[in-house]
Amino acid sequence: AEWGRIPDHIIVGLFNPDRNADLVPANDPRYPGTGNGDAYLQHVNDEVLPLINERYRTSDVRLLFGHSFGGVMVLNQLLTGPGAFDGYIALGASTWVSDRVLFDRLEAVDPDFGGAALYMAVGETDGGATVPDGELFAERLDALEPQGLDWVFEIRPGENHFTNVPEGLHRAIAFLYPFADQQAE
């Protein structure tokens, strides 16, 4: 932001005393307590965002970032309330969780995303079904022929579930703000 390549930002991190419950929208018996994700997003949209806007100097541009189950939360927000944020960053999203509930929501979504952007990436050696289900989610999103959604899905070579985050976040910022990656003159 100092060099004028991206707008000023404030970063808000939200504590999750029960991340499984807060981030996953439907019950998954493998992860006790899951299934409160929709209520958590409602809390973020109805209470947290207005509080941030009241207390801090903000703009109308909002980005949402999440990793792993947090990536599920990001994609769930995109599919169930796409107007709340302008940019979505989902890294290592566990799209397989809760019997692929996000796939069901993807099939039911209105394909007009109103001008949002999505950067989605998994590490090449991300465990379990994260890579194949991430690819399948991207294929199904592409098949929707989404309107008003600038998006990209990447499999990050040599990266795993955790090492994907720092470089993935950098690549997401460069994708969302194309001038962010240029050298200062």
List where the protein language model places each region.
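Non-catalytic cap/lid and distal C-terminal segments of serine-dependent acyl enzymes
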Residues: 1-185
